[in-house]
């Protein structure tokens, strides 16, 4: 669990000006203080938005705070270091790349908070240099020593004895040397292409004959383990426990091993220097869908181009010489402002390998999801269809098992001879997806199967293309959605013959049909046989597979046409109901739980609700551009963020005065509301809305461990040190363990 005394290391003073606050030590990066902002009724000030890029970096800083929290199990802390690194990689590949493109094209479109692309890039560079250094220091000064205390060592070549060096010499010659390609640079050998996110050694070699020096590059193979484990040499003994304890693990980074054998790679030369470096390339591309008849081929062409995207970041070891850096800047065409200098190891995303060690005592207590009570097998197992005919079911993953609910729903539909058709959207799915295999089996059994596979899902394009082809080969009707839009909704429709009638069964969720991430992501889903939702999903799939453009639905809000308008309309209705009931009753309440809150129109609607006296409570995992708690326009808005063992991924919206609960796939962002097909469904069953209400109350409990957003844009750990505290996710796990 996250400690209230956050970031407990010697360097935490760099990160704070007072207890429990994270922010950059550069005051120019801070958002305007609340005192500079005021507004009268129905007026909204110009500085009402927080910068979305800075807000994202703040989110990643909260992830880093978990890594620095010494109350968490040690390998969980290493995992959060890896997550931080992967997050930052993607941020540069997409967000920074997009800002650079706009800056280079002189598209001086300002952000909602008034910054040009260049100003944002400057701010990002300063913030990133600070937080990347902090990331490295948390590893070097806190996590790495703690690993050593538990018998897990990441060592250097100089730490090894002769027996270990002999062992690694054999390993290098047999397993590593054959796959390495040293690339020298001279008039006959141009500077080599450096692939994005690859780890490399920049080497200077000297010719003994004339003393001339040449640059060479060695790529660290990405198809072998980053950390080479040495043979176990003993055990950590816990004499008080009376057992032998755990084996000692000693790892050498692969780049250290290669560096030790550079003379083997460059025989007859003197190795003058070597330094690690890594570049990040632009991976933000678009397919001109309206100009290409074959979207699949167009996407594959763009994927091939992605690896040649322009560099957007150069990470270097902090011991790199100026001359070596100047050469890399020149040859890679990188601006000095895009250089991130890192002490210690580059690319800590590789710590996933260390997390994979079989050391359960250093990880979170195991949690096994339970089967939803409605689907639990008793004396006579009942089909999911029979259960849904009795009433709707709300599943909450990972606390409820995905395999025994959503996955079983689709598998039963596949095996049921009375099922005529299955229609499903697929955005991201697992590599050995049981969902996709079930759809293939259904098609081979003669059922009508439609799969909308979103092949433009970023960084999952290749996997989705493979699945699309496998589905087509099995006879599934595969479509790629609507031109110009990504299909991000999570929907499944099963059509079943029941006597003389046809009944439709549906699933609408907030998370992907991915059995692996369903164990790690927190999501909710509605399983129902309600006729109005069945009719809505029929219309939606007809719109996705045909040329119809359905705009109004019975029980759904559908982007890109209906969600923003529908949410703002309900905010306005909540305000009206609040006024009608009398502001003193405090009836007006809007609660939102989501991944990101950025859309200016939705934010402005919430500001106006606050001005009318409606209380607004927001639980946001990542980006939040809304400035809460400011007199005159947002004093009734409260924002918090919950991070922990599971990734909080569900989207839930509640309007108390008008008594409506909505769940679905959409965050309040431009891309979700304007450039994606998203679905929000209203949950009407009082049993289910009570469950959603309980979930929101737990997340918003004053004693729940969280981060709270201040008017100046800084995030504060809450509750404060010494106060009673509860963990939202742990509370839910204990409730399910006790069943």
UniProtKB/Swiss-Prot annotation:
The active site is at 488 (phosphohistidine intermediate). Its cofactor is Mg(2+). Residues 27-40 have a biased composition (Low complexity). An intermediate of this reaction is the autophosphorylated ppk in which a phosphate is covalently linked to a histidine residue through a N-P bond. InterPro entries: PP_kinase, PP_kinase_C_1, PP_kinase_middle, PP_kinase_middle_dom_sf, PPK_C_dom2, PPK_N_dom, PPK_N_dom_sf. It is an enzyme of class 2 (transferase). The lineage of its organism: Bacteria, Bacillati, Actinomycetota, Actinomycetes, Mycobacteriales. ATP binds at residues 87, 521, 621, 649. Its EC number is 2.7.4.1. Mg(2+) binds at residues 428, 458. GO terms for biological process: polyphosphate biosynthetic process. GO terms for cellular component: polyphosphate kinase complex. It comes from the Bacteria. Residues 22-45, 714-739 are annotated as: Disordered. The keyword rRNA-binding does not apply. It comes from Mycobacterium leprae (strain TN). Keywords: ATP-binding, Kinase, Magnesium, Metal-binding, Nucleotide-binding, Phosphoprotein, Transferase. One of its GO terms (molecular function) is metal ion binding. Residues 724-739 have a biased composition (Basic and acidic residues). Catalyzes the reversible transfer of the terminal phosphate of ATP to form a long-chain polyphosphate (polyP). Belongs to the polyphosphate kinase 1 (PPK1) family. It catalyses: [phosphate](n) + ATP = [phosphate](n+1) + ADP. This is Polyphosphate kinase. The keyword ATP-binding applies.
């Amino acid at each position: 669990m996250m400690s209230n005394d956050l970031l407990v290391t010697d360097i935490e003073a760099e990160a704070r000006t007072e207890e429990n606050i994270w922010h950059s030590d550069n005051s120019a990066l801070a958002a305007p203080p609340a005192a500079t902002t005021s507004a009268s009724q129905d007026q909204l000030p110009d500085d009402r938005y927080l910068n979305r890029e800075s807000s994202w970096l703040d989110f990643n800083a909260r992830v880093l705070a978990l890594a620095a929290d010494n109350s968490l199990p040690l390998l969980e802390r290493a995992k959060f270091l890896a997550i931080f690194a992967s997050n930052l990689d993607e941020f540069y590949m997409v967000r920074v790349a997009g800002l650079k493109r706009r800056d280079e094209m002189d598209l001086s479109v300002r952000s909602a908070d008034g910054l040009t692309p260049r100003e944002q890039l400057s701010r990002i560079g300063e913030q990133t240099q600070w937080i990347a250094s902090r990331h490295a220091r948390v590893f070097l000064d806190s996590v790495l020593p703690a690993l050593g205390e538990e018998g897990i060592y990441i060592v250097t070549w100089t730490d090894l004895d002769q027996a270990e060096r002999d062992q690694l010499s054999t390993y290098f010659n047999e397993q590593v040397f054959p796959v390495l390609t040293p690339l020298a640079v001279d008039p006959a050998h141009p500077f080599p292409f450096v692939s994005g996110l690859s780890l490399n050694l920049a080497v200077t070699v000297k010719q003994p004959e004339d003393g001339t020096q040449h640059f060479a590059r060695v790529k660290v193979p990405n198809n072998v383990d980053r950390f080479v484990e040495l043979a176990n040499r003993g055990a950590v003994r816990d004499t008080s426990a009376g057992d032998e304890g755990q084996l000692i693990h000693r790892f050498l980074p692969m780049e250290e091993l290669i560096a030790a054998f550079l003379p083997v790679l460059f025989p007859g030369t003197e190795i003058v220097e070597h330094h690690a470096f890594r570049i990040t390339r632009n991976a933000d591309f678009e397919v001109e869908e309206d100009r290409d008849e074959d979207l699949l081929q167009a996407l594959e062409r763009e994927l091939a181009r992605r690896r040649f995207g322009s560099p957007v970041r150069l990470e270097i070891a902090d011991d790199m010489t100026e001359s070596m850096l100047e050469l890399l800047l020149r040859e890679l065409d990188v601006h000095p402002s895009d250089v991130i200098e890192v002490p210690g190891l580059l690319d800590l995303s590789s710590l996933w390998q260390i997390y994979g060690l079989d050391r359960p005592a250093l990880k979170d207590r195991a949690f096994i999801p339970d089967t939803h009570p409605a689907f639990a097998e008793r004396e006579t197992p009942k089909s999911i269809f029979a259960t849904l005919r009795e009433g709707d079911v709300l599943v909450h993953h990972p606390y409820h098992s995905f395999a025994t609910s959503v996955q079983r729903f689709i598998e039963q539909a596949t095996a049921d001879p009375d099922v005529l058709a299955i229609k499903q959207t697929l955005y991201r799915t697992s590599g050995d997806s049981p969902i996709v295999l079930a759809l293939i089996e259904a098609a081979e059994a003669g059922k009508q199967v439609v799969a909308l596979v979103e092949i433009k899902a970023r960084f999952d394009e290749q996997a989705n293309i493979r699945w699309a082809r496998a589905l087509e080969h099995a006879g599934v009707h595969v479509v790629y959605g609507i031109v110009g839009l990504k299909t991000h909704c999570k929907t499944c429709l099963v059509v079943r013959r029941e006597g003389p009638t046809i009944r439709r069964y549906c699933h609408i969720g907030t998370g992907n049909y991915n059995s692996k991430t369903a164990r790690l992501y927190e999501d909710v889903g509605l399983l129902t046989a309600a006729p109005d939702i069945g009719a809505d999903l029929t219309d939606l799939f007809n719109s996705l597979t045909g040329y119809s453009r359905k705009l109004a639905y019975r029980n759904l809000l559908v982007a890109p046409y209906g969600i923003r308008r529908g949410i703002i309309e309900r905010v306005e209705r909540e305000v009206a109901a609040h006024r009608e009931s009398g502001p003193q009753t405090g009836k007006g309440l809007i609660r939102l739980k989501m991944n990101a809150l950025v859309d200016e129109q939705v934010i402005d609607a919430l500001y106006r609700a606050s001005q009318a006296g409606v209380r607004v409570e927001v639980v946001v995992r990542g980006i939040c551009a809304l400035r809460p708690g400011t007199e005159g326009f947002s004093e009734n808005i409260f924002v918090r963020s919950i991070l922990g063992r599971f990734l909080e991924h569900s989207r839930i919206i509640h309007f108390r005065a008008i008594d409506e609960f909505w769940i679905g796939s959409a965050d309040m962002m431009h891309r979700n509301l304007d450039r994606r097909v998203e679905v929000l469904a209203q949950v009407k069953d009082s049993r289910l809305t009570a469950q959603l209400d309980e979930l929101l109350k737990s997340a918003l409990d004053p004693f729940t461990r969280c981060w709270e957003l201040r008017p100046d844009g800084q995030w504060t750990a809450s509750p404060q040190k010494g106060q009673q505290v509860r963990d939202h996710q742990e509370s839910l796990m204990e409730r399910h363990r006790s069943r």
